[in-house]
Amino acid sequence: MITARFVIRTLRREWRLPELRTLIGALLLSVVALGAVATLAARVQRAVVMSAAELIGGDLGINAATPLSAEFVQRAHALGLRTSALAEFPSVAFVNDRSQLLQVVAADAAWPLRGKLVLARHDGADRSMHAPSAGQIYLDHRALVALGLATGERVQVGGVDLVITGEIEQQPGGGDLVALAPRAVMALADAKSAGLLGTGSRARHRLLVAGAPTPVAAYRAWAKA
């Protein structure tokens, strides 16, 4: 019968062999390397997910040609998710004898849920904001130059007279190469009251949600069903 003492003596003798120690060392190194790769892959995946969320302004976005029904918002809130509604469309800005085509985002006060809407400041500091209040509009530098305007002045968009309260420096989705026109952000309520989102408009509606990964995944599955 093999005793414990015999097993211990055998292990001690085998451990003195360089080949065995090299093999065990290689196995340990492989385990450590695999663990490091798995950790790195998980971090990269999280970074990619976060970058995508910052790009669209939320953890998940649902696009539609018409406004989504209230059921979509109610379901998100039932899961403990935050929501934001917006619409994107082209429109023309007028001031005196000048006009300029704009790519407009009309958003509610919660936008963006992820990422930053940054307005330029003359002192060089960033100014992170949400969408403007009713009666206000943000324009990017190209729009201001084209219209010969500055912050604090007024501009007409879609028949609505708005005060320019900020210069857009950065916004979610602002790197879209398809949007060749200068950018503007206005209140969703103003766009609705001006009839810019009515029948026949070229608006693209979007509902954004944000929250913990599990309820976001549950909401995605529900929306796809």
Which role does the model predict for each range below?
Residues 2-225:
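Membrane transport/envelope proteins' first extracytoplasmic loop
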